[in-house]
A protein has these predicted regions:
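Generic hydrophobic/packing signal
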Residues: 4, 11-12, 48-49, 61-65
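A short, highly charged nucleic-acid-interacting micro-segment common to nuclease
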Residues: 1-17, 37-40, 105
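Charge-dense, extended regions
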Residues: 227-293
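A short acidic/basic microdomain associated with nuclease active sites
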Residues: 17-53
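Catalytic cores of nucleic-acid endonucleases
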Residues: 2, 19, 23, 57-248, ...
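Generic structural microfeature
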Residues: 10, 56-57
Length: 293
């Protein structure tokens, strides 16, 4: 079906006003359809359909995912985490990362040499946070969520009001941004195909109850004196100078609150204090960690 946006548009074309389909054994006619939008960010619903039969009206709010899509959320921020997990988002993320904290403590932090996909000269600032529908990489695990919380993640139940009450074809519609169906089949060729292949989100969660997280390193590249932006970090490396040695401390209790710039500036401050410019200047006399490769 081609790229993601084109696939969405094609589905909406199938669901144009006046289109007829059978749903739950009854014939319906589309009254309104469109892509819900809001001022900032995106609702969970990709395709909104209001249809009526001779007896009732139905709102079909579809979250469309490509079949091979691994990411549920790949640029997690504090704001987005609260919208996905609700008010307990800090505890939820901290519990998930501390459940695999041994893996974090095993990680190399200073790369005097290139290692796997980490370039020579890197020093780790912390780890970004991603949500996936399957396990991904070494620093990955299962989110500790109830079935109801997983439903909330897929449906968008905790989204801010502007994302929940999104605009469809110029009119604000209550809860239009909260999805109630998921569609993961790209091979749809008619309105009836869409209806037949979409799955109620609660039913989807019963079949796929697990959501996974993966943590990807954000590194300060000492030779280039750069890092990849002010990304929120689920686990931070709090660098310090103790007894004239560069010492790391892993911090798990401030997920996504502390960002890359703050950690990088702290690291650079203590590197300068110890007359360290690149990893070539780090040795057994000025290093307070054995996590060096």
């Amino acid at each position: 079906m081609g790229d993601f946006g084109a696939a969405e548009r094609r589905i909406l074309e199938f669901m144009s006003k006046g289109t007829e389909f059978v749903f739950n054994g009854k014939g319906y006619t589309v009254m309104l359809s469109g892509k819900p939008t809001c001022h900032k960010g995106e609702p969970k619903t990709d395709i909104y359909i209001l249809a009526e039969s001779c007896e009732d009206e139905v709102e079909i709010k579809i979250s469309y995912k490509k079949e091979n899509a691994d990411f549920i959320e790949n640029k997690m921020s504090a704001e987005r985490a609260e919208q996905l997990f609700g008010e307990d988002w800090i505890d939820i993320i901290e519990q998930s990362t501390t459940a695999i904290q041994d893996k974090f403590y095993e990680r190399m932090l200073i790369y005097k040499n290139g290692f796997r996909r980490t370039e020579k000269g890197s020093i780790t600032l912390g780890w970004k946070f991603e949500l996936l529908n399957k396990s991904g990489g070494d620093l990955s695990g299962k989110m500790l969520l109830t079935d109801e919380q997983v439903v909330d993640v897929y449906a968008g139940s905790n989204l801010s009001s502007d994302k929940k009450n999104a605009s469809v074809c110029g009119q604000t519609i209550r809860d239009s941004g909260v999805a109630n169906y998921i569609l993961m089949d790209e091979n749809v060729y008619s309105a009836q195909d869409v209806i037949d292949k979409m799955i109620p989100i609660r039913e989807y969660v019963m079949m796929h109850p697990d959501i996974y997280f993966a943590c990807k390193a954000l590194n300060y590249r000492t030779f280039a004196e750069k890092w990849d932006g002010n990304r929120p970090l689920s686990v931070q490396v709090n660098w310090d100078a103790i007894n004239n040695r560069l010492v790391p401390e892993l911090v798990f209790d401030k997920p996504l609150i502390v960002k890359g710039d703050e950690v990088a500036e702290r690291l650079i401050h203590y590197m300068r204090k110890l007359n360290i410019r690149t990893t070539e200047d780090i040795d057994e006399d000025n290093s307070g960690t054995d996590k060096i490769v």
